[in-house]
């Protein structure tokens, strides 16, 4: 699905729309106990994915209900696999991710 930045007739010439994925991943009830020992590995991986351009933005909601990420990927399945591979998922910090296509405004 990620087609890269697109030019559309109704979009100004100095703006492009990039299709990416907005991902919401709820924290489990056990997350406060499990998260600290996994956090270093998780943050190291997220930082690497940001440097590689796969993850655009990532962070947790202040009320500790979920994490929100913007991810570049071709398909929803690819996004969900990326989340499944994270230590927060295998370690019981995250569960039940959802991914939706998202039009990101990119100035040229």
List the model feature ranges, each with a label.
Residues 1-108:
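Conserved, structured core segments of small domains
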